[in-house]
Each structure stands twice: as C-alpha cells, then as structure tokens.
C-alpha cells in the first residue's frame, strides 16, 4: 500500500509539471503509468502475490488511485488541446469579404437545345409531343409504313435486329402509327426521340435523334405543308433563307419531297424530308383516305444542329468533350 501511495503522489506531481507541456508529453506520461509496463499496470499484476482474502480490497484501492490519476490526465489533456486551439484561432483570420469559390453552371447539350427549339415552335401551332418504344416491331417500323419486304432499309447492314420481328427503331415513324391507332383525326403530333442505324462516319452515328411531325385532317394539303416548313426553317435559322422542295421518294408518303436551304457558300443543303401521308398508311390504321389526308415531316436533329452552329463532324456531339460543349452555353 505504501508503494501505491508513493506512485500516486509521483503521478500527481508529474502531471503538475506538465501544465505547459504539449500533448506528446502527456502521451509519454500515459505510457509510463498506464502502458503495458506502466506503474499502475505492475501494481495490478502484483495482486497475484497478495493473500486471496486481501486481493479485493487491494484491487479496489489500486483502481481508485488509477481512476483519480486518469481523470487528472484527461482534464490536463483537454486543457492543453483547448489552449492550442485558442492559439490557432487567434493566428487564423478569415476575411469574410473575400469572394467565394465560383460555381460553374452547366448547360444544355446542343442536341437538347435543338429539340427544345423545334418542339417549342410546333407546340405553339398546336402540335403535341408523343413518344414510343425504342425497341420496335417490324410491323410498326416497316410494314405499317408501306415499306416493302425487299426494301434495303430492312437489311442487316442498315438495321440492328434482335430477331426477325424485333429491332432498334430506325425512325420515330412508329409513334405516328401507334398514335393514329389510338386517336381519331384531327391529329397533330410531333415525335422526338433516339433512332438507330448501322452507320458511323463524319455525318452518321449508330444512334442519333429524329423529330417527326404528323398532321391528319380533312383537306390537309401540300400547300399547308410548304408554308409550315418555310416558316419553321426561317424561324429556326433566324434568317430569311431560300428554301426549295425537291421531288423525292419515301414509301410512306406520296408525293414526297426533300427540303433544301441555301447555305452561305451558295450551295443547297438538305435539311429534312416530307410528303403527304400515303393512302396505304392511313388504311393500315383504319383511317379512310377518301375522307382524310395528312402530311408528315422527318428531320435529323444532329443535322439541323450542325447546320445551325456550323459543326463539321456529327460525332462531336457524342464525344463528351467539354471544350466543344461549353461553346453552346
């Protein structure tokens, strides 16, 4: 017991001398008195040499002395840490007038910008947005659109097939068919979405975006179609462009045309395709072509964007190069 009293007094005295020392000195003290070979640890180990009937009382006294010294040690540690914090706070000054870190806002992808501009224009004319599945059946992608079985668009080198009846849609025209099956004329819709074709070069990618328009009503005619597209192209390019309609062929429209605008280099540039909905397409969805007529328009979003912003390589839209994309913010 005399040894316990002596060790306790020595510990108290040592702690008093550490009032202006750092955390490292306190850690050395802890190891000296409470480590594996520390003074209090050895006292506890020495209990095995004490008579069994005296061990409980002796153990309680050692633990009491140990707890007292630990409380002083912890209090001293908190005191030193607080003093160090106060010094640090005194030395560190925060200039609240300094500007904060600049948060860089993101921007819309150029393809999204074009889709937004196109849909806004036509929505103001009463067209609503419709959507459909990207994994499409050959009926909605080809058969219902009056595309013959031998048409080259059905070939494996042009189309991604899952099996003889399912494919990744090559156009959003299937949305037109599904809409006409569900709704009765008058119908006025636009169908923006992703489409897929097996092609990859400077002006083609395996996935791209398309917007199609469909208008079905009594007495819909090509004159209305021409006027609509004239107004759209001038609004989209924000110029009074020269526009021409060239006779063309699409299985799902008759007559059909491709639309060109005059570029700044004096050359005609193709921008979209259009035509009057083929009577067979109307019959396939249960609409009488003798009573109703309609027109359809198909445009590639990336192509419109390239022409609008003078982009030379369509693949740039999908390479996630921030140097390119930041130009459209």
Curated annotation (Swiss-Prot):
The gene is pheS. Its EC number is 6.1.1.20. It catalyses: tRNA(Phe) + L-phenylalanine + ATP = L-phenylalanyl-tRNA(Phe) + AMP + diphosphate + H(+). Keywords: Aminoacyl-tRNA synthetase, ATP-binding, Cytoplasm, Ligase, Magnesium, Metal-binding, Nucleotide-binding, Protein biosynthesis. Belongs to the class-II aminoacyl-tRNA synthetase family. Phe-tRNA synthetase alpha subunit type 1 subfamily. This is Phenylalanine--tRNA ligase alpha subunit. Mg(2+) binds at residue 254. The keyword Ligase applies. InterPro entries: aa-tRNA-synth_II, aa-tRNA-synth_II/BPL/LPL, Phe-tRNA-synth_IIc_asu, Phe-tRNA_ligase_II_N, Phe_tRNA_ligase_alpha1_bac, Phenylalanyl-tRNA_Synthase, tRNA-bd_arm. It holds the Pfam family Phe_tRNA-synt_N. Gene3D superfamilies: Bira Bifunctional Protein, Domain 2. HAMAP family: Phe_tRNA_synth_alpha1. Its cofactor is Mg(2+). GO terms for cellular component: cytoplasm. The keyword Protein biosynthesis applies. It comes from the Bacteria. Binds 2 magnesium ions per tetramer. Tetramer of two alpha and two beta subunits. It is found in: Cytoplasm. It comes from Actinobacillus succinogenes (strain ATCC 55618 / DSM 22257 / CCUG 43843 / 130Z). GO terms for biological process: phenylalanyl-tRNA aminoacylation. Its main location: cytoplasm. Transmembrane segments: none annotated. GO terms for molecular function: ATP binding; magnesium ion binding; phenylalanine-tRNA ligase activity; tRNA binding.
């Amino acid at each position: 017991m005399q040894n316990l009293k002596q060790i306790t007094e020595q510990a108290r005295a040592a702690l008093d001398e550490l009032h202006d020392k750092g955390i490292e000195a306190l850690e050395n003290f802890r190891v000296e008195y409470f480590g594996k070979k520390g003074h209090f640890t050895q006292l506890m180990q020495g209990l095995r040499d004490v008579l069994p009937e005296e061990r409980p009382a002796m153990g309680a006294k050692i633990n009491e002395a140990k707890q007292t010294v630990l409380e002083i040690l912890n209090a001293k540690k908190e005191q030193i840490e607080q003093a160090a914090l106060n010094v640090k706070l005194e030395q560190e000054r925060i200039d609240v007038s300094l500007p904060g870190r600049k948060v860089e806002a993101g921007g819309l992808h150029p393809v999204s910008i074009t889709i937004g501009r196109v849909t806004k224009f036509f929505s103001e004319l009463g067209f609503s947005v419709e959507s459909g599945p990207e994994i499409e059946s050959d009926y909605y992608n080809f058969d219902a659109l009056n595309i013959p079985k031998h048409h080259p668009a059905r070939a494996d080198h042009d189309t991604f097939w899952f099996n003889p009846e399912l494919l990744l849609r090559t156009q959003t025209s299937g949305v037109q068919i599904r809409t006409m099956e569900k709704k009765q004329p008058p119908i006025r819709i636009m169908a923006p979405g992703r489409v897929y074709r097996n092609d990859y070069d400077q002006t083609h990618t395996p996935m791209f975006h398309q917007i199609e328009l469909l208008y079905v009503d009594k007495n819909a005619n090509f004159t209305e179609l021409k006027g609509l597209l004239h107004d759209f192209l001038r609004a989209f390019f924000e110029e009074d462009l020269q526009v021409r309609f060239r006779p063309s062929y699409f299985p799902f429209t008759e007559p059909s045309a491709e639309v060109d605008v005059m570029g700044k280099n004096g050359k005609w540039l193709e921008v979209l395709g259009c035509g009057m909905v083929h009577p067979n397409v109307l019959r396939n969805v249960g609409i009488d072509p003798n009573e109703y007529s309609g027109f359809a328009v198909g445009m590639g979003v990336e192509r419109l964007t390239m022409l609008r912003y003078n982009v030379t390589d369509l693949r740039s839209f999908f390479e996630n190069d921030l140097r390119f994309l930041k130009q459209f913010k």
